[in-house]
Amino acid sequence: MNRIIFCTFFKKKSEGQDFQSYPGKLGKKIYDQISKKAWEKWIEKQTILINEENLNMFNLEHRKKIEKYMKLFLFKK
């Protein structure tokens, strides 16, 4: 069964994600407020950022940087 949520990214009701894709409180917020389509848009943007900035996801500082970009992208904050 599809979950319908109010997506804060698109500012409209949309199909929610099937499962929590990100850990912790931020992951719960994403699961509750970000639609499946918005999350897919973020994954595309994340791939571009990792490649353009030559980020290594084994590096803690690089993961923090991606998380910062993710918050800005998804929540405009």
Swiss-Prot record:
A GO molecular-function annotation: iron ion binding
Annotated InterPro entries: Fe_traffick_prot_YggX, Fe_traffick_prot_YggX_sf
Keywords: Iron
GO cellular component, one term: cytosol
GO BP annotations, alphabetical order: cellular response to oxidative stress
Assigned protein family: Belongs to the Fe(2+)-trafficking protein family.
Assembly behavior: Monomer.
PANTHER family (alphabetical): FE(2+)-TRAFFICKING PROTEIN-RELATED
Function in brief: Could be a mediator in iron transactions between iron acquisition and iron-requiring processes, such as synthesis and/or repair of Fe-S clusters in biosynthetic enzymes.
Protein known as: Probable Fe(2+)-trafficking protein
Species whose genome carries this gene: Buchnera aphidicola subsp. Acyrthosiphon pisum (strain APS) (Acyrthosiphon pisum symbiotic bacterium)
